[in-house]
Amino acid sequence: MDICMDKEPDGVVVYANGDSCNPNQENVSEPLLDSVSRDDANVHTELRYGEENIEVNEYDVKECTSEIPVGKPIGDDFESKDVTKSSLHAKHASKSGRGNNKTRNTVPQPFSLATEKRASSTRSFTSESLESAGLKKFPDGHSKVQSQATKVPRKPLQPKNKKLSDEEDSCSVASYATSGAKSAKSRTVVTAAPSFRSTERAEKRKEFYTKLEEKHQAMEAEKTQSEARNKEATEAALRQLRKSLRFKANPMPKFYHEGPPPKVELKKPLPTRAKSPKLGRRNPKEGNRAKGASRRHETRKTLVISKEDHDDETTRNADQINHKEMNRNLEPETAFAC
């Protein structure tokens, strides 16, 4: 059996056929023997890893003592010796176990036992490594804790073509069923009546419309009030303008109130009556009489005609007298006409 240990964090892979240590190859022909051999190899590699850690610790202690010549504490020597003894005992046990595996036939065991054995071996190794990497006392008298990271190799990967057994499938189905039942019990919801939001929306809409109506009414009232105020202001401005348009006249003079001066009344003579002339042949006597009558009418005086004298002399003298009187009466009328 060849053991191939890689220092990568993927761990250690052991092959029973003696092939090259390629971690990608898979041995499918002998799965049970491969698993047992891998467990033994893991134990052996873990022990070797513990020995390397112990040797490193001893080397560090020796360097410290060589640099500073101070007496080593006794407790550290005893602890280191105990660790070396336990590691040697584990080596002998692993060698004897490998020889027995070659001679005896392997018995098929379930996968669970191999995992338990691997877990127990890792626990024992970690406890030993922690004891070895404990407190270290330095010669200056101060105690310091040196924590070394214990690298635990990973478990080998299972081959890809392995399938779960029927028992594991049944267990997984049963566990899934139980978990589903528990979740169903925990998910029990109390039934309640459905609450519709349409009623709430209708109420909100109604409130909104009422507020809108109130707002519109307030705006209309304010508008009417503003119109009334503007009307009153315009009327007051018109009144002031009319008052300013009235003009004030100065008092009239005295002669306007007094009447015109009285007019002098003129005495007019009475109007004369028109008389149509007699047309035709006239006697000389009648002609003279007509002339005298016209003159009398013109002078507006009645003349007393004496008895007709048959004598021409008497008539001529009377005519002359009347003619003089007429001239005297006509003088004031001609002066007024001018």
Swiss-Prot record:
Induction per the UniProt record: By light (at protein level). Down-regulated by dark (at protein level).
UniProt keyword RNA-binding, yes or no: no
One Pfam family recorded for the sequence: TPX2
Record GO biological process: cortical microtubule organization; negative regulation of unidimensional cell growth; unidimensional cell growth
Post-translational modification: Ubiquitinated. Proteasomal-dependent degradation in the dark.
GO cellular component terms, A-Z: cortical microtubule
Any one GO MF annotation of this record: microtubule binding
Subcellular compartments: Cytoplasm, Cytoskeleton
Coiled-coil region list: 210-240
InterPro entries: TPX2_C, WVD2/WDL1-4
Tree of life domain: Eukaryota
Chain spans, region Disordered: 68-204, 248-338
Primary localization: cytoplasm
Keyword Cytoplasm included in the entry's annotation: yes
Record key words, sorted: Coiled coil, Cytoplasm, Cytoskeleton, Microtubule, Ubl conjugation
Polar residues biased stretches: 97-109, 121-130, 172-189
General function of this protein: Microtubule-associated protein (MAP) that regulates the orientation of interphase cortical microtubules. Binds to, bundles and stabilizes microtubules. Required for the organization and stability of cortical microtubules in hypocotyls. Required for normal hypocotyl cell elongation. Acts as a negative regulator of hypocotyl cell elongation in the light.
Similarity comment text for this entry: Belongs to the TPX2 family.
PANTHER family: PROTEIN WVD2-LIKE 3
Name recorded for this polypeptide: Protein WVD2-like 3
Source lineage: Eukaryota, Viridiplantae, Streptophyta, Embryophyta, Tracheophyta
Encoding gene per record: WDL3
